[in-house]
Amino acid sequence: SGAVRTAARLLELATEDAMALGERTDQEERDALLTSLGVAPGGAVPSALRSQVKSLEEDQKRRKTRNLRDALDRILVDVMSILRDVLMVQVNTGLTFINVTHGPAIEERAAATTPEMTLAALDATREARERIAHNSPPLLVLEALLISLSPAVKGRV
């Protein structure tokens, strides 16, 4: 379905964003550690020092996971800001959109849904953020969210 493909694409974008933040830094940190331990660039790491290198690699892996969760959270915050704009249109606040470049899509969504549906979508997005923060599988969280946001799910969101 379109929601599943979109979820996969969003995860791909978030992963690219997260990896871009860390790859160069990871190599620089590893090189700095090896230099401080007296290991020549490209040289073999003595067994007595491997635990320090392993510890650094584990820290880097945790940071990558955190970067991915942060990137996904940024996407979900963007979704929430769009839904906020939809709700503003639905309740006729007269306030300016936050996401002015998406005005036509916001107007279309506002006309096609009710304020109750938009509030449910905001709640589903908040729940997705919580699930990501609690280490749920990101692809499953995004798929569930996007399926729940799809217009085909009548009466829910």
Cite the ranges covered by each PLM segment.
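AAA+ P-loop NTPase domains with strong preference for DNA replication initiators
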Residues: 1-113, 126-134, 138-144, 148-155
